[in-house]
Amino acid sequence: MNLMEVRELAPSRGQLDVAAVQVKFDSTELLEDRISRIQDLVSGVGKADLIVLPELWLHGGFSYDSWRKNAISLESEVFTFLSEVARDKKAWFHAGSFMVTEPSSAASDMWNTSVLFDPTGSLRATYKKIHRFGFSDGEPKLIAAGDEPRVVELQTERATAITGLSTCYDLRFPELYRHISAEGTALNVIPACWPLTRIQHWQTLGRARAIENQSFVVQCNMTGVDQEVELGGHSQIVDGNGDILAQADKEEAVLRATLNFDSLNELRSSFPVLNDRRADIWAAKGKTVIASHL
């Protein structure tokens, strides 16, 4: 399938069983041991239509010095393994994000790339993180920025879910979610490596993105410690009314919830706030009036 394919999407409907796996990061763990542990965690999830892992669970979200050394390509054995996991689980599998290089790009280019596999194990979508965290250091200094929002149609026997992909720091930028909501997104999946020190932002912003776009939000965070940064955990699944369907604490955990898109459609019909967007104004540049006097 062409990952860049553009076509009209069917409306979201039905019910989707989701599992978000909150992973504990251990910087002393060998990469092969971490991969094996992830396999055990996902195998223990049980039946689900969509399984989600956190951002950079393989590399470490704050392990900047090892990113380049441990970067992988989409042809890596890691992705072959993840494809097999999706096929074995017969589930959509958002395998989190990875430091990815591409043969056709400049040698210095590396992206924080999320990957989504379908139940047959086929790679159905990738998303390069658009907003890089770290200001003048961290991600802006080390990796390239993505520039393409990504929406994918998840199909199961019971549901169709128009799903937007984003990553961690993207959560702070509501314009991304409003932009993809115009494509009909009813679910936003957000893997992260969010620190404990700003965990109240993580929780509040997730609910805000759900409320303002009347969409489900699945936030899958890391826990543990990475380069002396205490990771926040508190993964959560939120409905389109801002109500929390499931929430973790700081322990490694699997969150589960059933997303009812028929109920979401009823919410959107009974309170059609999205119909009142003024895209004509926001698309026009130079129209803001600066008032110098009352």
Swiss-Prot record:
GO biological process terms held by the UniProt record: nicotine catabolic process
Gene Ontology MF term list: 2-oxoglutaramate amidase activity
Catalytic residue positions: 55, 129, 168
Entry's family note: Belongs to the carbon-nitrogen hydrolase superfamily. NIT1/NIT2 family.
Top-level EC class as recorded in UniProt: hydrolase
EC number: 3.5.1.111
Protein name stated in the entry: 2-oxoglutaramate amidase
Pfam families: CN_hydrolase
Functional description taken from the UniProt entry: Catalyzes the conversion of 2-oxoglutaramate to 2-oxoglutarate. Together with glutamate dehydrogenase, may form a physiologically relevant enzyme couple, leading to transformation of metabolically inert 2-oxoglutaramate derived from trihydroxypyridine into glutamate, a central compound of nitrogen metabolism.
rRNA-binding as UniProt keyword: no
Species this protein is from: Paenarthrobacter nicotinovorans
Presence of the UniProt keyword Hydrolase in the record: yes
Domain CN hydrolase: 16-261
UniProt keyword list: Hydrolase, Plasmid
Catalytic activity: 2-oxoglutaramate + H2O = 2-oxoglutarate + NH4(+)
Pathway of action: Alkaloid degradation; nicotine degradation
